[in-house]
């Protein structure tokens, strides 16, 4: 057994610079970390109503379902015009969207997304409190843990859009937070804590899937067993009934969907069989070959935590290596750290078995990873932080270069001098931190947020006058049917935010239909062209805007790598009126 002094040392993220430090230095450190956390919070609200924020393609199908369900005037059944996508997810996210948009009356991206940002910030609060508790109540560690959680790219990408992840992560991390934060009283609670955990887990399942009960249940079971020092008899006597209660309550909450929906058979066919059982179908090669080879293998999933961290990927690898060294050689991991590492490992092992493997499935353990990183942040090699800060600097420089390319191709000033000055200041501060290694622990995370804000600034032009249709254009097509291009499920839903009041219909932009055929078919039509495309001389153009091309082919990516970036990244979109076309 390790001594109490060894446990104390392992829990303290920076024992030498904490209580032994002068009061002024401790205060300065709290101010610096608090400022970094505040910068992170502001970053999450910046550009929240943008169509271009980092996300994945599921946001618009989910918005489509929420909008049609709101228009129906009923909570259930869920509504959709998409084939086999009416019950693609449980109803909690869609109910959230219905409430936040006041039954679709305030249909804006901000209204759809802000509840998820609040969920993400609530998770940051849990992470901060856990960091504070695990470090023997060091406020600095709590601030650092919350900031790290917000700095993960997976949090930024999936914790802001109208997706299931923000609510799912909050509710499914809350049980682990409660057990670790309360300690023995929470574990020994006969029914109060298990009841609360069951309710939390059930709500989390209503955001994503009943299948998540498996990793959560295994994680909780292992934690209870670990609290009993791996004594099977005591575990069976004191905790198995609690785990059964948690499972029954959580499944009971999830079963409300079946009980309240007038068409439960469709839920079974579309969600249980199609959405969940289908994840064990290898869709091509055999199950085992896909498990061990290809881009969906377990080896790719093993990099999932680092991929989720984004610019902090190297830090994740360093923390994992450091944790492994301490577990095997030093044997000085605290009990709190062991519990968190076990949850990180259990979630990875569970999601090795479905044939569809993605780093997105590991999001529930990212809060635990943020706490673990905060506990050792100031013990990391300066080279790890140096490379991470260098990556942030390069990312900001590349985004600035893309902005210059766009402005050059458009042929007019679209970014202000203030934007350029702020860009130079951010780069100068990061370069200074690279030259003065002592600054790295304090400026690496602000550097990550600076990269996110630079991306927001670059994308801002697509949400300004040049990236939106004018009010005059919107009024001209209000109440009219406008045919818009799309290449992914329900991607046409975004045009309801660009042309509010218009009746939006989609056509496949990847079908290769010539322009003259499109003009014959559709009275009001939106087309997308490269910036350098020739003007349509006989077209009646009601409006146009700048846009980003969301998906590039392999050939286009190769061309971009060789320097032909603007032609394959930027688009000009035109709204054409064919209603009086003499042809």
Predicted regions and their residues:
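Transmembrane-lumen/periplasm boundary regions of multi-pass, lipid-linked membrane glycan transferases
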Residues: 62-68, 157, 199-203, 207, ...
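Short acidic/glycine- and proline-prone juxtamembrane loop motifs at membrane-interface regions
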Residues: 112-113, 157-168, 358
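Transmembrane signal-anchor helices characteristic of membrane glycosylation enzymes that use polyprenol
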Residues: 28-59, 226, 246-262
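Transmembrane-helix signature of polytopic, membrane-embedded enzymes
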Residues: 36, 127-151, 338
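Membrane-embedded architecture of ER/inner-membrane glycosylation machinery
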Residues: 195, 323-506, 531, 537-538, ...
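Transmembrane-helix motifs of polytopic, lipid-linked glycan transferases
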Residues: 114-136, 174
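Membrane-interface transmembrane helices that cradle and orient dolichyl/undecaprenyl
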Residues: 11, 132-136, 175-194, 204, ...
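Extracytosolic helix-loop segments that constitute the early lumenal/periplasmic catalytic or substrate-binding loops
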Residues: 43-47, 61-85, 92-95, 99-102, ...
